[in-house]
Design a protein with these regions (language model features):
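Ligand-recognition elements built from short beta-strands and adjacent flexible loops
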Residues: 271, 412-416, 433-563
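Conserved, well-ordered alpha-helix/loop/beta-strand core segments that scaffold catalytic motifs
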Residues: 86-130
Length: 563
């Protein structure tokens, strides 16, 4: 039982007689409850404090444990008859101090979209692991972050590690953006320069190919759009006499350093210096296409977000503010790591190339309706330590949307896909699903806001049809009834000409949608389906912890956020 339920129970007959006469003995225990299940589980994290030993601090909870845990109290206790203890009031007593509340930037609905899209693709590809991150372009606040790994014992995917934060690997072709940024900024090339994409590029006794394709002579812009490895030749020809100039250009962006994330475990980026003993004649061309260096998915996303954000490199953040009672203790503002990663002209060139990748290049399979996506595909072999490169691949797509006035940046990385290895197919399709659903949701919000601002009739709750019709007749509101004659539950939409009502369908075996309903109607429907309802707040239902349409399990708890 919850604490409020126990207090109500104590007032019942017999139970109100106390411990000895009524037999009501309450045993208290603390239980960690996750109303949203496994959503963002690793990023939300946990904290385990062991006296005399090193504490285990994971994710947001681990990072902000000093705020969350509060302070323990202290009280003198006296042992009395029956092996019981009673408190003794004295000046040594110290009242415990409750912890603060940490408000994250993660949007539950967007998190569900990202996690569902990633999980579906990992299952389809029978991949080893993957991650997807969605971030606000203008602020750097992370709105969704999904990390899934395959468990060979249970044959299911779960959140075991924060790959987006901690997995530093060779990014592959998504790094070509950084390579051309440096070459453009240092005046070595223009995107209109002509290059010959022969399909094979030799460096000493090694070579790179375009996967059997020959694109012929065209511009650097087209080479980027096609993800041709002629870019390795371009970088090599311009920097072979002074490789450190190229490396210094990368360091000026800031991608050689950690982002300084609030949560622990950020992977260390690795950009090889020209003085490194392992720097060989082929290091420069290999680096230019994302090998012989390492970056985490979140570090790559920060770079692409900077392009979308007019050159401003932001620190990704997970917490908006910390609150104690009604007082905000700490408010987190966007944090700038680099005010300008490049000039305006270079920025415009980069944007044009990223848009071209989706419009005409390797990611033309993810073109969206109603808005444009900009981004870059990446496919790289995964190094197997001393064994070299085997047949394991990493597929990725990083970009932002909409291409004009971007709202969100996003990266999807999948390791060990078995059916397809290309970033456009494996990760690009996940990116597109996230972008489509997020954009539709944001566009819907904007439309509703405009519509509501010009309506002359009041907002109406979703819920019981008969109750709604009685109320609307009493106050004289015109109703456009588009629902079926037999339906009990309706959705409403307020307009200039009155209120339109339609049938609210609840499919058997799936969690119903009760958002927009009053608590009484919502509770009636959910309990009818066998769910245990826990309301939080007052007003109408704004959020439900189990998304509508998910498979229903009787006895499962669902939290309703009211407002």
């Amino acid at each position: 039982l919850r604490n409020d339920e126990v207090e109500r129970l104590k007032k019942f007959p017999i139970f109100n007689l106390g411990k000895y006469k009524g037999g009501c003995i309450v045993l208290k225990s603390n239980k960690r409850v996750k109303p949203y299940g496994m959503l963002a589980n690793r990023t939300v994290g946990y904290a385990v404090e062991n006296e005399g030993k090193k504490s285990i601090l994971v994710g947001i909870e681990g990072a902000f444990n000093t705020y969350l845990k509060g302070q323990n109290g202290q009280m003198l206790m006296e042992k009395i008859r029956g092996n019981e203890w009673k408190p003794v009031e004295n000046e040594l007593s110290v009242e415990p101090v409750p912890g603060s509340d940490v408000y994250t930037s993660i949007d539950v609905n967007l998190q569900d979209v990202a996690e569902s899209a990633l999980l579906k693709q990992l299952k389809d590809q029978k991949a080893q692991k993957g991650c997807a991150v969605l971030m606000e372009v203008k602020t750097g606040f992370v709105k969704a972050i999904a990390n899934l790994s395959f468990d060979t014992e249970t044959e299911t995917y779960f959140e075991a590690q924060n790959h987006a934060v901690g997995l530093a690997s060779e990014p592959g072709s998504t790094f070509k953006l950084a390579s051309l940024l440096v070459a453009l900024e240092q005046g070595k090339v223009k995107i209109t320069d002509s290059v010959d994409m022969t399909g094979r590029y030799d460096f000493y006794d090694n070579y790179l190919t375009d996967g059997g394709k020959v694109y012929g002579r065209n511009t650097i812009k087209v080479a980027f759009e096609k993800s041709s490895n002629v870019i390795s030749q371009i970088i090599y020809d311009n920097y072979k006499k002074d490789p450190q100039e190229f490396i210094d250009g990368l360091k000026e962006i800031g991608i050689h350093q950690k982002l300084g994330l609030s949560i622990l475990g950020e992977g260390t980026p690795f950009i090889k210096e020209s003085t490194d003993p392992t720097f060989t004649g082929i290091t420069l061309p290999w680096m230019s296409i994302g090998y012989e260096l390492k970056m985490t998915p979140l570090q790559t996303l920060a770079l692409y977000n900077a392009v979308a954000n007019e050159g401003i490199l932001l620190k990704p953040q997970f917490v908006r503010y910390i609150k104690k009672g009604s007082e905000i203790q700490k408010y987190f503002k966007p944090e700038i790591l680099n005010t300008s990663i490049c000039s305006k002209s270079t920025l415009n060139d980069l944007k044009a190339m990223l848009e071209g990748v989706v419009e005409r290049g390797t990611a033309n399979n993810i073109k969206a309706r109603g808005f444009k996506i900009a981004g870059k595909t990446g496919t790289s072999k995964i190094a197997q330590g001393s064994k070299g490169y085997g047949n394991k691949y990493q597929a990725s797509f990083c970009g932002y949307f909409p291409a004009k006035n971007p709202m969100y940046s996003c990266i999807v990385v999948v390791q060990g896909p078995t059916k397809n290895i290309f970033g456009s197919v494996v990760s690009g399709s996940v990116f597109k699903e996230i972008a489509d659903k997020v954009y539709a949701q944001e566009f819907k919000k904007e439309n509703i806001a405009v519509e509501d601002s010009i309506n002359q009739y009041p907002y109406s709750r979703n819920g019981d049809k008969e109750s709604f019709l009685i109320a609307s007749r009493k106050i004289g509101i015109p109703v456009n009834d588009l629902s079926s004659n037999t339906t009990q539950w309706i959705s409403t939409r307020t307009g200039n000409n009155g209120i339109k009502i339609i049938t609210k369908e609840n499919k058997k075996g799936l969690v119903p949608n009760v958002i927009g309903m009053g608590l009484i109607d919502a509770t009636y429907i959910l309990e009818k389906y066998g769910l245990l309802v826990q309301p939080v707040g007052s007003g109408i239902v704004r959020e439900q912890s189990i998304r509508a349409g998910f498979k229903l399990y009787k006895g499962q708890k669902i939290v309703l956020q009211l407002g």
